[in-house]
Structure formats: structure tokens, C-alpha cells
């Protein structure tokens, strides 16, 4: 004896679920477009179990890189200031000497100070170069965070695809078909919602959502 098919107790609530899924899908589409990801991303290779932790990881790595760069700049600044101050002072003293040559003893002192400055320059520049290297190395976070963001975007793309499939499989036929037929003359060929996996382009996704009223 055949069992009667079980129908949803509240058809309106089922419709609300479909509407909410459609709205969420539309939001994801708009977000992808705003990020410049208009072209379809490759299908998800693997899911990220906890997107919140991944985002926190990206924020953490970015903050650490910024801190390393700022620390290096702050460490280098005194060395640059010292060289600038000493160079300006020596330049002024040499200008004064050429304008009015001084005694031999004072000239020797000027030469000695100049030689000391030249001897100190390599130490300052070496320290500064090390800090510049640290700033450059701090940028390696971009490779790691870029991979994480790419995986998250893949997952978002997969979620969008799955939500579209839910709409295709569950939208009431009597509600979706008239809308597609009414708009077919304006928008051209529409997506065949009777087949799975037919969403082939971004324009088709938009047309599908429009035809379903989202």
C-alpha cells in the first residue's frame, strides 16, 4: 500500500526560506562583484572548517607585519638623523674654512672630525640596511594571507553555487516559470532551471536570480 507523500506543514515558511536563500545568494554575488571577482573562480578544492579563525589569522599576520615595519623605521630614524646632523655641521665648518682659512690646529681638528664621520657612516648605513631588509621580510605575510583569502573566496564561490542549486531544486514551478517566460523577450534566453549544474556564467546567475524574483 502506497504511503501518502508528506507535505510541509507550513508552505509559507518554506517560501520564506527560499526567499532568504535567494537574498543571501544575491548578496554574495554583489560582494564578489564589488571585490572585482566578476569571473568565475575555480571550484572549491577543499573547504575551510572555520572561516572566522582564518580571517583572524589574516588580521593577525597583517598586524604583525605592520608592527615589524614600524619598529624597523623607528630603529633606523636615529641613525639617519645623526648622519644628517653631522653632515650638515661638517659642511658648514668646511664652508667657513674656505671662506676664511683657520689656523693649522683648527684645520687638523676639522679634518679629524671629518675622517671620524666618514668612519662612522658604514656602521649607520649597515644598520639601516638591516632594518630595510627586515621591512622587506615582513611583507612575506602577503603570500600566506593571500593563500588563505584565496581559499576563502573559493569557499564563498562554492556556497553561492550550492545556494543556487537549492533554489533550482526547490523553487515552485508555478511561481518561477511565468516570470521566466515574461522576461524572456527582454533578456534573451534564460537559464533552464530544470537541469542541475546549468549556471555557466555570471550573467546567467544574475538572470536566474532576476527570473526568480530576487
From Swiss-Prot:
**Source taxonomy:** Bacteria, Pseudomonadati, Pseudomonadota, Gammaproteobacteria, Enterobacterales
**Location within or outside the cell:** Cytoplasm
Biological-process GO terms, alphabetical: archaeal or bacterial-type flagellum-dependent cell motility; chemotaxis; regulation of chemotaxis
Cell membrane as UniProt keyword: no
Which is one Gene Ontology cellular component term of this protein? bacterial-type flagellum
The main location is: cytoplasm
- The yes or no answer to whether the keyword Cytoplasm is present is yes
The name on file for this protein is Protein phosphatase CheZ
Sites annotated Enhances dephosphorylation of CheY-P: 147
Amino acid at each position: 500500500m502506497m504511503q501518502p507523500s508528506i507535505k510541509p506543514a507550513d508552505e509559507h515558511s518554506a517560501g520564506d526560506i527560499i526567499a532568504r536563500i535567494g537574498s543571501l545568494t544575491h548578496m554574495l554575488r554583489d560582494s564578489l562583484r564589488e571585490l572585482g571577482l566578476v569571473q568565475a573562480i575555480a571550484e572549491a578544492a577543499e573547504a575551510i572548517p572555520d572561516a572566522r579563525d582564518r580571517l583572524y589569522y589574516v588580521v593577525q599576520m597583517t598586524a604583525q607585519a605592520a608592527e615589524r615595519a614600524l619598529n624597523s623605521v623607528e630603529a633606523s630614524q636615529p641613525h639617519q638623523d645623526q648622519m644628517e646632523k653631522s653632515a650638515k655641521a661638517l659642511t658648514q665648518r668646511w664652508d667657513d674654512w674656505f671662506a676664511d682659512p683657520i689656523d693649522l690646529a683648527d684645520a687638523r681638528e676639522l679634518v679629524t672630525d671629518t675622517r671620524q664621520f666618514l668612519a662612522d657612516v658604514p656602521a649607520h648605513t649597515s644598520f639601516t640596511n638591516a632594518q630595510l631588509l627586515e621591512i622587506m621580510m615582513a611583507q612575506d605575510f602577503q603570500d600566506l594571507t593571500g593563500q588563505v583569502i584565496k581559499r576563502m573566496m573559493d569557499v564563498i564561490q562554492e556556497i553561492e553555487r550550492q545556494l543556487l542549486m537549492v533554489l533550482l531544486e526547490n523553487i515552485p514551478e508555478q511561481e518561477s516559470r511565468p516570470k521566466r517566460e515574461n522576461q524572456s523577450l527582454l533578456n534573451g534566453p534564460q537559464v533552464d532551471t530544470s537541469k542541475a549544474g546549468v549556471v555557466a556564467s555570471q550573467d546567467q546567475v544574475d538572470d536566474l536570480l532576476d527570473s526568480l524574483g530576487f
